[in-house]
Structures are given as C-alpha cells and as structure tokens.
C-alpha cells in the first residue's frame, strides 16, 4: 500500500523534493517533468548534522541504564507481503543474535500486519543483555544510533541515517529491497547463518575502516535550506499549475 500511495501523491504534486538521485530518476521515469524534480536530500538528516540528538550519558540517566556501550540497535518490522513468514524471520534474527556478546537494544515494530508476533517474540527472548523500547523520542533514538556498534533489522534508518554516523547496518530481507544504500549497508537474507555472517562482517575492522570517508548518498544536512530556497524562487505560473506526464 505504501508504494501505491507514493505513486498517487506524485501524480498530485506540482514540485517534487527527492531524497536522492535514484528517487529523481524514478520520478522522471514515471512521467514527471524534469523541471519539477529536485534532489534536496532526506530531511531527517538535518537533525543529525545540526547535532539534535542526546549524548549517551543523558540517555543512560533518562532510562536508568548503566554502562551502555558495545551494543546493537535493532529494529525489525513485519513485512505485510510475508505475513506467514514474519514469526520465523524474527526468530531467525533472535537466534543469530545469541551468538554475540554485545548488548541488544530493541525498538519494537510498527503496527503493520504481523507486528504482534514480532513483538511477542522479542519480549519472550528478553534476557539480561537486552533492553526493549516500545518507542523513543527522536533525539534519544539518534543518540543511541550514534553510539551503537551496528544497526540491525529492516528499518529505513539503517540505510538513511546510520551512514551519517558512519555506523554499519545489517539490512535483513526484502522490506528495503531496491532502495538506494551506501557501502555501510550489508544486505542479507532471513537465514540465521546469513545474518550471523553479515553481523561479523559489520564488526570487522577492515569493513569499518572503509567507512571513514563515507558520504551519505541521502544528503548532507541542508535539505530544509534547499527546500525553502526552491519554494521562494518558484513562481506560480501556468507552467507550474498545469501538469502533464512527459512519457
């Protein structure tokens, strides 16, 4: 349903603020006129570059967590099209994580179909190395990401936000399939051994050294600035108001 909604909104829009070059290409390929499409970057990165996130010591005090270091940040959402496999997939992830001594910070999933099974599985697996949050304030979430060793799961934040912190991410399954990703993202299947191998790769010194000069393909933290300028410079003319598909 998300994809269908995005296509519908695109047809109604007169100006498009795309998050990356691939999104620009897809919009134009779908029939949108080139002069309407701007690559401005992902707006959620503005917070990161403007340092609008909490320091780890503040987060520890707020949530009464002691010595929070050497941890994975994990967000695994159900996939509607894979409803029958959601429980098996989350159990594979839980099983894979048991092979690592790092602490696990879980953010419980959205409310899409299959969410209850995912939530129950995560809660049932809880041990002394795990912290589980139903949701977090944005500043806390970004602070936890900045200080994590890996971001694991199938959230878009593993593709979009984590590269700005130069934090590797393990992207599991099909939820983010075909989305633009940087070299910091390791894609893998739902298989337990594949997840284990991907986590080991993300923890390796050789892999992490490659990220020192990483530039986030989703932007540089100046999205709002670009959008404001474009809106100010755009004149409301017949050319803007009257749309036609260019294919």
Give residue spans per PLM region.
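A conserved, positively charged/aromatic
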Residues: 2-14, 145
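A nucleotide-sugar donor-handling region in carbohydrate enzymes
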Residues: 12-88, 247
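A donor-sugar binding/catalytic signature common to diverse glycosyltransferases
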Residues: 16, 137-183
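Short acidic-hydrophobic, aromatic-tinged amphipathic segments that line or gate anion-handling sites
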Residues: 18, 38-40, 133-134, 186-191
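Donor-nucleotide binding loops and adjacent catalytic segments primarily
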Residues: 53-147
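C-terminal amphipathic helix plus adjacent low-complexity
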Residues: 204-247
């Amino acid at each position: 349903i998300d994809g269908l909604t995005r296509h519908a909104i695109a047809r109604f829009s007169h100006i498009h603020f795309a998050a990356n070059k691939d999104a620009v290409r897809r919009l134009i390929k779908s029939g949108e006129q080139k002069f309407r499409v701007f690559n401005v970057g992902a707006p959620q990165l503005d917070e990161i570059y403007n340092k609008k996130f909490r320091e780890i010591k503040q987060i520890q005090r707020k949530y009464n967590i002691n010595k929070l270091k050497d941890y994975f940040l994990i967000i695994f959402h159900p996939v509607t099209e894979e409803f029958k496999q959601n429980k098996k997939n989350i159990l594979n992830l839980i099983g894979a994580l048991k092979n690592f001594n790092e602490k696990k910070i879980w953010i419980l999933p959205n409310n899409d179909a299959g969410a209850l099974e995912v939530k129950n599985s995560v809660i049932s697996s809880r041990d002394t190395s795990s912290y589980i949050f139903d949701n977090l304030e944005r500043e806390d979430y970004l602070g936890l990401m900045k200080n994590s060793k890996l971001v694991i799961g199938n959230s878009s934040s593993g593709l979009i936000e984590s590269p700005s912190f130069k934090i590797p991410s393990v992207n599991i399954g099909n939820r983010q399939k075909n989305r633009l990703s940087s070299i910091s993202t390791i894609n893998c299947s739902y298989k337990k051994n594949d997840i284990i191998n991907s986590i080991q790769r993300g923890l390796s010194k050789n892999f992490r050294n490659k990220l020192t000069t990483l530039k986030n393909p989703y932007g540089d933290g100046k999205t709002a600035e670009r959008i404001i300028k474009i809106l100010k410079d755009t004149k409301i003319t017949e050319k803007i108001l009257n749309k036609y598909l260019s294919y």
